[in-house]
Each structure stands twice: as structure tokens, then as C-alpha cells.
Amino acid sequence: MKKEFASPRKLLSVLLIFFLVSSLALAGCSSKNSSAETKTKDGKTKYTMWTFVQVHADYWKDAAETWNKNHPKQQIELKINVLPFDQMNQKLQVALNSGNGGPDIADVEIGQFAKYTKSNNPPFKDMTKEVEPFVPNLVKSRTDNYTVDGKIYGLDYHVGTTLVYYNMDIMNKAGIDPATIKTWDDYINAGKVVKEKTGKYMTSAETSAGFVFTSMVAQQKSDLVKDGKSNLSAPENVKALQTIQSMLKTGIAKTAEGGHQDNEEYYAAFNKGEYASVVMPAWYMSRMVGFMPKLKGKIQITGLPIFKEGDLRSAGLGGTATVVTNQAHDTALAKKFVVESKAGKEGSIKTWTILGFDPIRSDVWTSDELAAPNKFTDYFGTDIFKQMAAFKDEVGGLSVTNNSYPIINDEFLTNGLPKIMKKQANVEDTLKALDAAADKRIAAGK
């Protein structure tokens, strides 16, 4: 039965959007870029940037200072606004749809990117020409994520190289060297030994996020999308979920606290030594340093186990692109600034030294700067990137920015993963049903 009255929450959302549109329209009416508005008194070009992460703001503050030092004749003044994730996404979408009130530069989380590129005219500036000189040194899967019809519209902060983080206190007690774990079968067998000898779980199974699943999919060179339709029931994807489900059935894994591995409840459990390992991207190092102090000096990282010969040993997961919007002024300068800050050698190194991320330029992974002492090398040792460099050309990716991906991912996380992991539903049957449901939504544009 249809509800006759909108809920208070829905009314509040409508009012919020109305006020956002009104305020942005008013801002647009009064701010058509005059020289007084785009230049400071001393001649610097003024830009605004929106982001949803404070440390990203710290990075861009440094980037602007570095740019001004290196380009005395092209000085800029960067005003950075940090907003909560949902608020920023909603505000940015309204601004770009209305054509007024948006920033010159913005961060767009990878899962949101496809929302902006559905049309033939995305609201971002094409950076292909500016990025091209750097392409030989960039991890391809990272530029592919933000490429639409051959045009590059954004650059990421990191690769998101997926790793296995082993708690060596537990692994040593079980008598297992992670270097001997080559395949997922090896991993499961090692987990049985860990459980038997230490009573600890080998790992966890997510019920509300797909970090482990999607890394397994990408390493097999599969995808969740094929020709714009749902590809969830592909054999490789079925195998990935059956493998995770089997870890629960054999008792070497339990469902993750909070439903996934990137929340404070889970950090506390891992910090207490409840798990021998966790599969997460390289940016998870910052979570360990910040939330798992007891494990300092006790973590060993490796690439992913494989299913079969020819599989990749990692996947690039997560991400946030920095874009230049179509409301920017002096877009040529804005693009040069963003690209040099992200893809240039100095800027790429700073994604590690400031943010603790694995740079999108793989040629800097073995540089002295990335081995220099900091809070990350104190925690993990100085050979982090030497280890990752061994599989830098084996980082798979998914079609996350495909227009169909958000619908498919939503179906999977909402109607599939919880059933498979919590209720032990049949993997293949569930994924086939999800394909049908997702394709119906894709066809309807929902």
C-alpha cells in the first residue's frame, strides 16, 4: 500500500535540497567570476576546494604551498572546505546539476563517481592532456577508474594495493611462515592449524562490505559488471564467495565486528589479537597505526594468495579522485595544479609521507623517501614498499566507475552478502537472483 503522507525524514530531505538549490542559485547569481573575485590583491589565482577528509585538506594545503614555491609566476590561493561525507556529496551534486555554487576543485569518492558520468557531458574537466606525460609511471588501474570514453577526469590519492596483514605473534605460535602460503587453499589449511594450536580465528568474513570479495574477484580478472549488466554470478565470483563462506563453515573465520573490517569495533578486536590476519588495502596501515598500537612491530604484509596460476596477487580497492569541475575558472591552471600535485614525483611521495597511502606512481615505491623513518616505518618496518614492488604489476581492478556498478553493488551488499554469510545461503543461486534484480533496476534507470 502506498503511503499517503511523506515521512518527517523525507520532508526534511526535500526542504534541505530546496534550501541548497536556493542558496546555490543565489550564490551563482552574485558570483560570475569577475577578476576581483578570482584574484587576490597580490595577483594570486583564487580557487575553492571541497573535500570530506581532514587529512586530505592537510595534503592540499601543503600542495598549494609547494606549487607556489615551484611556480612563482603562477601563484594560487586555495581555500579548502571540509564537509561531512554525505553532506558534501549531496551539496556537490546539487551544485553541479544546477550549474552554480560549486567549487573549482573537489574530491569525489570512487563509489560516487559514476553518478556524475552518466551523461555525455560530465561536470568535470578532461585532464587527459595534463596526465599523459606521467602515464608511464602511474598504476594503470588507478587511471582507468576515472577514465570515461578515453578521457581522464580525475586522479586518485592511492593505489589501494590489497594486502594480507599477518599478526606474527599468532602465526609464530602456530608455527606458520606466511611466505609458505601461496594459494587460498594454503591459507585455509593454515587457518585450521592456527585455530587448532592457538584458538584464534585466521580471519573474518564481512557481512556489510565487500573488500575481501572484490579483491578476490579482481585478482581473477573478473568483474561485477559486463557489457553494462550484472555479472555477479560469473564463475570466478561464485568461487570467491564460496571460498569466504567455507572459512565460516570450517570455523577458521567469524563474521566481522560491525559487519566489516573498517570500523572501531573491529579495530579493537584485531588489536586484542582475536585474528591472525586480515585482508585489506594498503591504506589500512593508517588504521593500524592509529587504532592498533599493541601490534606495532608484529605485523607482516604479503600479497594475496591466488586461486590458480595466472591470477594477480593484489587488487586496487577504494579510492577518491580529485577533479576540476566545470564551474572552475582558469581551468588550465587548475588542472596543472591538481595533476602535478597528484602525479608529479614530489606530490606522489607526499601521499605517503603526509597521508600514509601507497602512491599512484609505482616508480617512487623504491625511493629513499618511502623508506625514511616515520610513524609507518616505525610500525611496519622500512621495507614496506620493497615488498609491494614485487607485485606492482599485478594489481587488478573493477569497473567501479561504470554507470551500472552502484546498482549492482547495492543489490549485492543489501540483498546478497548478508544472506550468504549470515544464513549460509547457496552462493550461485543467490548471485543469479541478484543479477536478475540488478538488471531490472539498470533497465529502469534506478
Report residues per predicted region.
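Short, low-complexity disordered leader/linker segments with a strong preference
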Residues: 1-48, 69, 429-432, 436-446
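Extracytoplasmic "Venus flytrap"
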Residues: 41-62, 83-86, 160, 400-405
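C-terminal lobe and pocket-closing loops
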Residues: 114-116, 284-295, 308-411, 444
